[in-house]
Amino acid sequence: IDTGDKSVEEQEKILEFDKFADIARKDAGGILVDGKSSGIMYAYAKCCNPIPGDPVIGYITVGEGIKIHRKTCNNLINLTSIDPDKLVAVQWPGTDGTLFVAGLTVKGEDSPGILNDIAHTIVSYRSTNIKSININTNDSTFEGSVMVYVNNLEHLNILIDRLKKLRGLYKVERFEGT
């Protein structure tokens, strides 16, 4: 993992995201190329860090197999303009009803009951199951991550919108790599 000239805090966040992404991808199973499982070598692009549920597409590379990108990845858009013939259809395995692990970053004012409020807001929407919660406090603020099982990106986005309405939370966003 390349952490370059990043601070210890930034390095910890990179490691935390990589751990999350590994769990989410392992839970989802292998990528399907042209609709079927295969022994084709592939890797996830670090530029956009796709996770299960993201619309994805593959880009054939030399020596690294197929790189899996989010369809909205700026780097992929640039690569496609150079050589569009290297694109290949890929998708996450599973069918409707499949649950994906998704991660959220939360920040806010530390107050009694805030963790309960976060958990209740999550489980009260479609009985969403929580995989893990990790919250750290510093003086009167907290920061942490929440991993949840969601059906799709719409499910995740609705959870984010619901959490943003909680008093005391001033940041709720999808867990992204840095």
Put a short name on every predicted segment:
Residues 139:
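Cationic-aromatic interfacial patches
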Residues 1-115, 124, 131-136, 152-155, ...:
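N-terminal non-catalytic structural scaffold regions of very large proteins
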Residues 66, 142-149:
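A generic structural motif
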Residues 130, 144, 167:
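Conserved structured catalytic cores and adjacent interaction surfaces
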Residues 86, 142, 168:
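Residue-level signal for beta-strand positions within conserved beta-sheet cores that form or flank
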Residues 120:
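Extracellular/lumenal glycan-associated surfaces
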